[in-house]
């Protein structure tokens, strides 16, 4: 078994079955099952879902969307990534798999926006994301130009 790596997940029935493992682990706001079901096309390679397999099973996942322009409230100009619903199965938490997913997004060298869910603010702080408060909610942003040393070759996916 090789070292786990981040890979784009196919939108198919196998991935749908893998997502069901996460259903009882997290809050409803982290569920991707319905989102996947709505987009299911057998083996679609343009999936917004990324994950880490370990021992043949999906153990961590996230959604990653490219957005065209952040605009005023987001403090981002130009294209950026929205990272949603990062989740690691309980048995595999605190082993660096969540950080591997985030580093995958960072190595694309676009600003990354995310919402800290379920007491995860410390996680985003540790990964050099900056908190931003606006009238319609709080979120975190990582800017590649201000974090040039935030990713080392050993950390990137």
Regions found by a protein language model. Give the residues of each.
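Short intrinsically disordered terminal tails
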Residues: 1, 152-157
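Short amphipathic alpha-helix that is part of the acyltransferase structural core
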Residues: 1-44, 53
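Conserved acyl-donor/pantetheine-binding loop and adjacent beta-alpha core of acyl/acetyltransferases
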Residues: 29-85, 93, 136-142, 147-149, ...
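Extended, folded domain segments that form the structural surfaces/walls around functional sites
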Residues: 85-86, 114
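Conserved acetyl-CoA-binding loop-helix of GNAT-fold acetyltransferases
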Residues: 88, 94-107
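Conserved GNAT acetyl-CoA-binding A-motif
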Residues: 102, 107-119
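Conserved active-site tyrosine of GNAT-family acetyltransferases
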Residues: 124-125, 129
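A secondary-structure capping/hinge motif
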Residues: 131-133
